[in-house]
């Protein structure tokens, strides 16, 4: 099996699927490039919410924590436990990365259901979760790939590449392809679930615009949280695996 053409084909697939579109979209023309304005607007809102919440959380910490401080400490403890479980005792430096991924995806997923889209009128289409666009999920998956390569090389040096011939050199092509397909699985899983959830809600609202879609929306909120947890857990597991060796 020729690994290089397969790897190039994998990258080409990632590039091709970046043009996947469902529904009507609003674009900005910047220079010679089309920029997906819906994704950027919602992403900026999500980033503003996260930065604002973080600023409030650390601005005036109390010895006897308030309800808000308790909530943020619980979130931090949850992310630390998740990182420690998947990565091991050397989890500390990776908590900010895993936490950022989890919180951005979690708030992005929920923004698709909770953001009052009609507040901001767009010439075409309407606002949606950033994670229902394949470009966003690929942009989240690729840094994860860089992170586990970096973790492995930092811990083991060039000896990290020895995992590709474990348990036998015959598996070298398969082990290499496994690393190149990880970002594909991460991005497609998140993109597919969030897009499907929003499409189901839109169809139900158009058919029965009253009480029936509400349970589906609550189910979507639950699914959105689960998808953020799955992405963060897998990202941490990949980093832990690269530091510990082939399993």
UniProtKB/Swiss-Prot annotation:
One of its GO terms (cellular component) is chloroplast thylakoid membrane. Keywords: ATP synthesis, CF(0), Chloroplast, Hydrogen ion transport, Ion transport, Membrane, Plastid, Thylakoid, Transmembrane, Transmembrane helix, Transport. It comes from the Eukaryota. Signal peptide: none annotated. The keyword Transmembrane helix applies. It is a multi-pass membrane protein. Gene3D superfamilies: ATP synthase, F0 complex, subunit A. Its main location: plastid. The chain crosses the membrane at residues 38-58, 95-115, 134-154, 199-219, 220-240. GO terms for molecular function: proton-transporting ATP synthase activity, rotational mechanism. It is found in: Plastid, Chloroplast thylakoid membrane. F-type ATPases have 2 components, CF(1) - the catalytic core - and CF(0) - the membrane proton channel. CF(1) has five subunits: alpha(3), beta(3), gamma(1), delta(1), epsilon(1). CF(0) has four main subunits: a, b, b' and c. NCBIfam families: ATP_synt_6_or_A. Key component of the proton channel; it plays a direct role in the translocation of protons across the membrane. Belongs to the ATPase A chain family. This is ATP synthase subunit a, chloroplastic. The lineage of its organism: Eukaryota, Viridiplantae, Streptophyta, Embryophyta, Tracheophyta.
């Amino acid at each position: 099996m020729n690994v290089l053409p397969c790897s190039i084909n994998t990258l080409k697939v990632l590039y091709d699927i970046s043009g996947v579109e469902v529904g009507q979209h609003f674009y900005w023309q910047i220079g010679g490039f089309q920029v997906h304005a819906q994704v950027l607007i919602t992403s900026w809102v999500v980033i503003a919410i996260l930065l604002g919440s973080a600023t409030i959380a650390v601005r005036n910490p109390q010895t006897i924590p308030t309800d808000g401080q308790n909530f943020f400490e619980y979130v931090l403890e949850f992310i630390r436990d998740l990182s420690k479980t998947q990565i091991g005792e050397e989890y500390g430096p990776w908590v900010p990365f895993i936490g950022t991924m989890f919180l951005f995806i979690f708030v992005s997923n929920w923004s698709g259901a909770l953001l009052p889209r009609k507040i901001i009128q767009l010439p075409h289409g309407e606002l949606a979760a950033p994670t229902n666009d394949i470009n966003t999920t690929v942009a989240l998956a690729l840094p994860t790939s860089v992170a586990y390569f970096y973790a492995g090389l930092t811990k083991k040096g060039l000896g990290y590449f020895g995992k590709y011939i474990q348990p036998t050199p015959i598996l070298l092509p398969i082990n290499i392809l496994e690393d190149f397909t990880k970002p594909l699985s991460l991005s497609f899983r998140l993109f597919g679930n969030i897009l499907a959830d929003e499409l189901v809600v839109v169809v139900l609202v158009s058919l029965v615009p009253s009480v029936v879609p509400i349970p589906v929306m609550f189910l979507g909120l639950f699914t959105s949280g689960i998808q953020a947890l799955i992405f963060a857990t897998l990202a941490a597991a990949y980093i832990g695996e690269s530091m510990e060796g082939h399993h």
